[in-house]
């Protein structure tokens, strides 16, 4: 078994997101922590899926892991937007329920049909990369819209916030921007852009930056985090 660079990045993503998810889900009584914990689980699905995609020896096996990985990827935009709206305490002009309905539609197509992910092609001599379908193209457009919309909301709040609150939002924007930018390179080979998705490893930096923000800038109340975690132990 050969561990490709793509597989290694997926493994690192899975590890960092698993740690963050465990901490946040331990605090599930706070809705903000719950949403962020579930978001980390969604990214964990991508990381674990990317690992197994990276070590798949044939296209049939890779298709299975692409579908498993996209169980998480499909939920990433709606959970990220939901967290942003809750964290910033603002109302979206587009109801979050619309995004969840769309998410369930894409999830159903991924799990029960071949209209979302159907086949792969060999890329870079080692990766069985998925081939886009019409429905996948629609999903990607929706993904990009939701993520850019969420980042626009964050950026707007940075300009209005002050003091420690501004630092919190700024670190969150930095972490999410790096994570989504790095993860975005994983979409390129889908469309025959022959750039190896090395930057996928940047997704693992997102939980690390968030962890720093939690401790340094009290993005979440670290005293509550420690107290709740010790209670559960």
Task: List the predicted regions and their residue ranges.
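Individual alpha-helical transmembrane segments in multi-pass integral membrane proteins
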Residues: 2-17, 27-150, 173-176, 195-206
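Hydrophobic, aromatic-rich alpha-helical transmembrane segments
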Residues: 7, 63-67, 133-137, 161, ...
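Alpha-helical transmembrane segments in multipass membrane proteins, preferentially the mid-helix core
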Residues: 19-23, 79-83, 143-163, 209-219
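Membrane-interface helix-boundary motifs at transmembrane edges
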Residues: 23-35, 85-95, 155-168, 219-225
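Interfacial "cap-and-anchor" motif at the non-cytosolic start of specific transmembrane alpha-helices
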Residues: 49-52, 165-233
């Amino acid at each position: 078994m050969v561990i490709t660079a793509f597989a290694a990045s997926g493994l690192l993503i899975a590890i960092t997101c698993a740690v963050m998810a465990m901490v946040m889900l331990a605090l599930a009584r706070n809705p903000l922590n719950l949403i962020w914990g579930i978001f980390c689980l969604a990214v964990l699905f991508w990381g674990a899926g990317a690992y197994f995609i990276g070590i798949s020896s044939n296209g049939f096996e890779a298709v299975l892991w692409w579908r498993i990985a996209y169980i998480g990827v499909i939920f990433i935009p709606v959970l990220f937007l939901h967290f942003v709206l809750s964290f910033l305490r603002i109302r979206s002009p587009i109801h979050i329920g619309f995004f969840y309905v769309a998410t369930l539609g894409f999830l159903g197509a991924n799990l029960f049909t071949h209209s979302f992910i159907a086949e792969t092609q060999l890329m870079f001599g080692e990766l069985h990369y998925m081939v886009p379908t019409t429905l996948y193209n629609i999903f990607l457009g929706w993904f990009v819209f939701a993520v850019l919309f969420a980042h626009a909301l964050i950026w707007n709040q940075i300009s209005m916030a002050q003091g420690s609150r501004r630092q919190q939002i700024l670190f969150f924007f930095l972490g999410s921007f790096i994570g989504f930018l790095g993860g975005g390179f994983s979409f390129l080979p889908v469309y025959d852009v022959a750039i190896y998705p090395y930057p996928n490893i940047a997704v693992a930096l997102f939980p690390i930056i968030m962890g720093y923000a939690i401790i340094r800038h009290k993005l979440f109340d670290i005293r509550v985090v420690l107290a709740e975690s010790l209670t559960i132990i």
